[in-house]
Amino acid sequence: SCLVTDGGGAVVLTSAERARDLRRRPVEVLGYGERTTNTSMTAVPDLTVTGAAGSGADAFARAGVTPADIDVVQVYDSFTITVALTLEGLGFCGRGEALDWIAGGRIRPGGDFPLNTSGGGLSYCHPGQFGILLLVEAVRQLRGECGDRQVPDARLAVAHGTGGILSTHATVVLGVDA
């Protein structure tokens, strides 16, 4: 077995009516968005702009929330630049500002911006199953199941995945009742 590539995850979807009878706290899909921007690197007009802006805007609008409302964020982190471009695209900070915005420990455990609270793909499981594990960690955070890494009072989470060569983006906003 290989820590870098082995593993898996699952998410079970059901109706709100059935979820009320489950043993675990239900987590609701509040909004989602998707974008595909290019089919090859040579077709990218600007390497600093990703489809996260479109997928994020759709997800936030459908959920009726803004980036400022989010308690915990899970993003696909294939490379450091992927994280920076995603945070900018989703609207957590301005274009070209991500590296300064996270400086000083903002995203470290206990920082004021809970990001990739499981450690992220660069720390424990890129590539392979990490996409689904973004959702799994977001759900666990919202249920209060994360022990030492638990974000206090987390009610809203964003999970964002990228595919291809930063060409495909999917964003989901999840939430729980207070």
Each language-model region and where it sits:
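Hydrophobic alpha-helical bundle architecture
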Residues: 66-74, 97, 101, 116-125, ...
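Active-site-proximal alpha-helical scaffold in enzymes
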Residues: 11-18, 125-146
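Short glycine/threonine-rich loop-to-helix capping motif typified by GTGT followed
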Residues: 41-47, 77-99, 128, 165-173
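Electropositive phosphate-/nucleotide-binding environments in soluble metabolic enzymes
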Residues: 2, 6, 46-53, 77-81, ...
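Generic secondary-structure signature for well-ordered alpha-helical cores
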Residues: 17-20, 34, 61, 65, ...
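Extended hydrophobic packing segments that form well-structured cores
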Residues: 139-140, 145-146, 151-166, 170-178
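Phosphate/pyrophosphate-binding loops at sites that engage ATP/ADP/AMP, CoA/4′-phosphopantetheine
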Residues: 55-69
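Condensing-enzyme catalytic core mediating Claisen C-C bond formation in acyl metabolism
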Residues: 1-58, 104-118, 122, 150-156, ...
